[in-house]
Amino acid sequence: MSMTNQQRRPPIRQYQGEAVTYIPLTELHPFPDQPFKVREDKAMRETVESVREYGVLTPAIVRPCESGGYEIVSGHRRKRACELAGTDALPAIVRDLDDDAAVILLVDSNIQREEILPSERAQALKMKLEAIKRQGARHDLTCAQVGYKSDGKKSVQIVAEQSGESKSQVQRYIRLTELSPQLQELVDKKQ
């Protein structure tokens, strides 16, 4: 049985002060142009086994879709692990996020992973930079959603500080996005 946003299951628990709800996998949609690939590698196999044994320990973060269901902001790998483990729902925190806040949260929740290809990091940093630039004078409206203030800094400096990269390294990564997909693949393969 499919549930609408209004009919979703009641919260099952609290996670860091937020209500967690089981959402059927069929109602979860990937974030558009999400730069991080969901690989079915050893780490995924281990995640699937963990989901089978313990369930999903950290809930996904989703936002309601206007067309129904939910868009995954953080939790694409957990959703795939649930599919492979044979479960039908994913514990998630539902947040009302505008597009820019969702992009920033998506990038921030994935950028520190160890297995990120240079092209993925480049696209993620570019997405975050563009989202911060779009916010412009609206930092006061969205800073609570993403947890920072600009303090008059340039967008690229904010991205650099939050990603642990230098400003020039962030700019180099972003230039990678201008390469053809074939050249990006060669960079990813270190060729």
Segments from the language model and where they lie:
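Short, charged/polar connector segments at secondary-structure boundaries
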Residues: M1-R95, A101-E115
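Amphipathic, charge-rich alpha-helical segments that serve as recognition/docking helices
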Residues: F36-K37, M44, R80-E178, Q184, ...
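The C-terminal cap of the DNA-recognition helix in HTH/winged-HTH DNA-binding domains
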Residues: E53-V56, L179, D188-K189
